[in-house]
Amino acid sequence: MEGQLLRGLAAQQDCSIREKIDLEIRMREGIWKLLSLSTKKDQVLHAVKNLMVCSARIQAYTAELQKSKEEIANQTGARLVLDSSSENKEGESCRGKIALSDIRIPLMWKDSDHFSNKECTQRFAIFCLFRMGAQVFDTDMVIVDQTVTDICFENVTIFNEAGPDFQIKIEVYSCSAEESSLTNTPRKLAKKLKTSISKATGRKISAALQEESPEACLLAGSVAGAKYHLLAHTTLTLENAGDCFKTHNLSVHGDEECSFWLPLYGNVCCRLVAQPACMAADAFAGFLNEQQTGKGLVGWRRLYCALRGGKLRCFYGPEEIEAKVEPALVVPIDKETRIQAVEKDSKKMHCFSVLSTAAGRAVSHIFAADSLADFQEWMGAFRQHFFDLSQWKHCCEELMRIEIMSPRKPPLFLAKEATSVYYDMSIDSPVKLESVTDIIQKKIGETNRQFLIGRDDQSAAPPWAAVFDGNHEMVIEKKVLSPIGEPAPDGKRKKRRAPLPPTDQPPFCIKTQGRANQSKDSATQAGVSGASSSPSDPRLSPPTHHLQKPVAAPRKLLPARKNSSADIGHTDTKTSLDAKPVPVPRQKSIRDILDPRSWLQAQV
């Protein structure tokens, strides 16, 4: 039964690996199709790089699958499998995370190459490949020329489930990024071969192109002009891990005669961080009773203890860990710590002592478990923790932080050149300044210098334009204002009463008759209109004073208007009338004066 369970777990692991292999195969087929349609140098370089990464992952998964099959085949019985697995489990250390970041590869150019010919420098495409067991990762591709002194990769690569015996192989690949070497993609190369050789061979190549896998026509990774070559490599282990930048040696391949060669300094600088699980999480946690002695008395206090990172932290409850409360007691657990069982106490049976060194002196603590099972679990956790500390070595002295960098902007040499951006811009201006000037000059010539921007060409000229247009006869007419056309006074303004008639003069009376009064009334109206239009005429002012209709004057004088000469004249007339007021009889209204019956009474 146990053997079947183990076989089932192995089968699930094999199924997971096969799914990964199928995924990489589908991705590789898609990359081949994109590569056959790529025409730009950046597209070809990225496609070939991704193709190499997929092939490397397929090889790693295949090797892992073959290794698991061999392990299952070597096991002959279920009992043997169980025994060996339990033995291996006791001898295995905890897993951990490995982070590789901030890779710098210095270059060593000649002075003549670095400081001269900056406009015509050779460019190279560089990327790194990291391998650890079945895990394969890559970095971004960067473009390097003779003006660059360091190859920089800003990626943060994290390997999960790594053991203390890990080995990370760093491979640096290079490819020439010249235009002339990147023009031939697989399909284009095959078409050229088809047209340059015999028809029979051309048909074979055409049939090969119709197949799903382009590898039938051309070998993988050997695309003409876009092949990456191994430039340098190195292997990093636990000894190279640290919480700071370190320099490691590189094994360089090739020489100056190779097209992909770069003058490497022979070193790589990076930050390799190892974070064991026993440092990042609790190895074991549970309740323990600590013995306390004072003044000859022995007491026990119950604490919740957590074993992590070479320390036994004791709290009064598990909720204090979530609240990030300072522990009540911290006991160091390192390679110098000694743990042993003590004699059975009358009250506490499962006791053990922890002898550690603190501040240069030995300190002993006695703990008791609640049951035998808890006691055995704690003893096993201490043994495993000691084994993990011995395997991960200096990585367990202090927790190393893994910094996951936020996405940054691409380096300057990856950005598009300013000249190409300028040429790609499309300035579609509907009208240019020169064309506007030409249109204005043309309009001025057609309209005999009378063109006005924003007006209609056929619009009539203003009346005052004749004054400035040569010698012309002009007729100026006075504008006669009738009383009917005058605007009505504002009803909102306050009016004042007319002054009282003087007492030393007799009241005015009308001595005319019949139609003579009617003609006199018409003459009076004409005189009033003439006086309002031209007050300076002395012939019109006397009848105006004698026959003017009494109108109540306003209480407050209005300000004189300056808009027209007629208003100024009217104001002067009012001023003269106010200076010499003529009394008007208030006993009769205009209706009584115009009534014929009043004329008869006057004659009598």
UniProtKB/Swiss-Prot annotation:
As for what it does, the entry says: May play an important role in lymphopoiesis.
Compositional bias (Low complexity) spans? Answer: 529-543
Name of the protein this chain belongs to: Rhotekin-2
- Asked if the Swiss-Prot or TrEMBL record annotates the protein with the keyword ATP-binding, the reply is no
Entry-linked Gene3D superfamilies: Pleckstrin-homology domain (PH domain)/Phosphotyrosine-binding domain (PTB) (2.30.29.30)
| BP terms from Gene Ontology | hemopoiesis; negative regulation of intrinsic apoptotic signaling pathway; positive regulation of cell population proliferation; positive regulation of NF-kappaB transcription factor activity; positive regulation of non-canonical NF-kappaB signal transduction; signal transduction
Pfam families on file: Anillin, PH
InterPro entries from the xrefs?
AHD, Cytokinesis/Rho-signaling, HR1_rho-bd, PH-like_dom_sf, PH_domain
Q: Which SMART domains match?
A: Hr1 (SM00742), PH (SM00233)
- The UniProt entry's coiled-coil ranges are 53-79
This protein's UniProt keywords: Coiled coil
**Naturally occurring in which organism (per UniProt):** Mus musculus (Mouse)
